[in-house]
Amino acid sequence: MVYVLNIEGKPLMPCKEAKARKLLKENKAKIYKKEPFTIQLLFICENQTQDITLGVDAGSKHIGLSATTKEKELYAADIELRNDIVDLLSTRRQNRRTRRNRLRYRKPRFNNRVHSKKNGWLAPSVKQKIQTHFKVVEDIHKLLPITKIVVETASFDIQKIKNPEIHNEEYQQGEQLGFWNVREYVLFRDNHTCQCCKGKSKDKILNVHHIKSRKTGGNAPNNLITLCETCHKGYHNGTVELPKTIKRGMSFKDATFMGIMRRSFYNRLKEIYPNVFMTYGYITKDTRIKHNLPKDHYIDARCISGNPNAEPLGYYFYQKKVRCHNRQIHKSNILKGGKKKLNQASYLVKGFRLFDKVEFEGQICFIFARRSSGYFDIRKLNGEVIHRSASWKKLKLLETRKSLSMERRALPPIT
């Protein structure tokens, strides 16, 4: 299937490959985009379109998209979102605090973050994911004349997940009610006893230890455990191992994100596009089971669009959101001589950039790493290694890098 734009750049109904080849051969159209393949007409034509519904399966790690008519699916995509932003923000915060710790005479800055006081402010990690949702919807509107959007969002009762029998005022009476802080609660919960040696070390000094690092696990009580000073130091020195029974509790990061983005995404989408509707996960699941469809993000999106019986496209587009630019000038480690290694790579290496789409020995892949000598680590978007040190002389540039890398994939066989 080939997507078509009119002479003014507005989307029309897609056509078959043979029709597109004929138009290109007769110089009645030009290539507008290679992935997904799109042509633009060079003559004035009637702008006849059909009703197309876009189903959006919103998520915290993946987005499913499917544009359908009643008879046929016209577009299907699975978008992988970035999940490294929280770690990067934590690393940046750690570096910033380390720098300021060397200047103790400087007046501390801790209460002048005015952005968080503004109405509608979102954390950078959440904001970036929501912006990606808007971008992929906008990109499809540039390819197809979408007339209706249906979005599946989800709301999670985290307190109900923790305690199925909770009701009424118990929602305001959480597990930390009556305690000054999290540390006091964790010590009380663990009966002021080391959870590693159970008090055998006779060490009276107790520490609250993060099971997973604070950077990735957070400060929630289910990520904290009581350890004595002896076990705590021994664990960090590598001489003590925690019992296998000590595990981090259930994480609700994804559920929290969906609760934040639910109304924010839907309400703003209604301001941009005219016909936007909301559906829910239980409706999608019921539709998928009734039509005996496998579970996948783009298949859920087809069910969300209201046309589960539409003829499948036969393939789908896998997209991955990549980092656009690393603004860190130096590495953190100090080299011999008190110097810091530069963190900025060359803008171009032999005419190629990071995440450029290239062809190598008949295979389409992406540049994942580069060397100034002109050798590249090339892979598929799923991380499959094609060659760890391919010469630039053997590479053919297909597309320059974009914030959303895209590759076409065949549908998996139905079992």
Model feature map: region roles:
Residues 15-47, 175:
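Charged, flexible boundary elements
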Residues 47, 68-177, 243-351, 397-414:
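Substrate-contacting helices/loops that form the catalytic groove of nucleic-acid
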Residues 356-357, 363-379:
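Short beta-strand-centered aromatic/proline hotspots
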Residues 142-148, 179-207, 228-231, 353, ...:
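Short cysteine-rich loop/turn motifs with clustered Cys
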Residues 56-58, 380-415:
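Glycine- and charge-enriched low-complexity intrinsically disordered segments
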Residues 50-69:
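Gly/Thr-rich phosphate-binding beta-strand-loop-beta motif of the actin/hexokinase/Hsp70
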Residues 195-226, 237-242:
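Histidine-centered nuclease catalytic patch
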Residues 45-47, 178, 182-190, 218-222, ...:
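Short, flexible, mixed-charge glycine/proline-rich loop motifs
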